[in-house]
From Swiss-Prot:
Cellular-component GO terms for this entry: cytosolic large ribosomal subunit
Keyword annotations: Ribonucleoprotein, Ribosomal protein
HAMAP family documented for this protein: Ribosomal_uL13
Protein name: Large ribosomal subunit protein uL13
Alphabetized GO MF terms: mRNA binding; structural constituent of ribosome
Gene3D superfamilies documented for this protein: Ribosomal protein L13
The protein's assembly and partners: Part of the 50S ribosomal subunit.
Gene Ontology annotations of biological process type: negative regulation of translation; translation
Keyword Iron on entry: no
Location of region: Disordered: 130-150
The family this protein is said to belong to: Belongs to the universal ribosomal protein uL13 family.
Domain of life: Bacteria
Gene, per the UniProt record: rplM
Pfam families named among the record's database cross-references: Ribosomal_L13
Length: 150
């Protein structure tokens, strides 16, 4: 009889990956990054453990969406006060805080529990091509999602 091997916390080898979001489709990029954060690209993947890697995303302001989503996709937040709902379109949020768009898309694809919050902390999103994690020697993760963008 075979036994399932659960990797120990010490045996998990974490890598750092760098993803350039320039001209990438938002949802397609988010699914690939969520998979790497979760650790599904490793043979030691375990659903209830954090076996994933760190991901750095640069050029978040240059991400694309298809169709009319730039004007039609809405991002909502609420202050908790009566009448405190704020609604913003994709284009206006991309001008203001482009990192939030990518973070929100990826966070929605992670588990909605304590494990998902732990996985989300390994995601680093930056506007522009500069990032402060060069000491970790991130490997470039090439994701080709822009076949459908015109």
């Amino acid at each position: 009889m075979n036994k399932t091997i659960t990797p120990s916390i010490d045996s998990i080898n974490r890598q750092w990956y760098l993803v350039d979001a320039e001209n990438q489709t938002l949802g397609r990029l988010a699914t690939e990054v969520a998979s790497v954060l979760r650790g599904k690209n490793k043979p030691s993947f375990t659903p209830h453990l954090d076996t994933g890697d760190f991901v750095i995303i640069v050029n978040a302001e240059k991400i694309k969406v298809t169709g009319k989503k730039g004007m039609q996709k809405l991002y909502r937040r609420h202050s908790g006060r009566p009448g405190g709902m704020k609604v913003e379109t994709f284009n206006s949020l991309q001008e203001r805080i482009p990192e939030r768009i990518v973070e929100k898309a990826i966070k929605g694809m992670l588990p909605h529990n304590a494990l998902g919050r732990q996985l989300f902390r390994k995601l680093k999103v930056y506007k522009g091509s500069e990032h402060p994690h060069s000491a970790q020697n991130p490997q470039v993760l090439s994701i080709t999602t822009n076949e459908l963008v015109k």
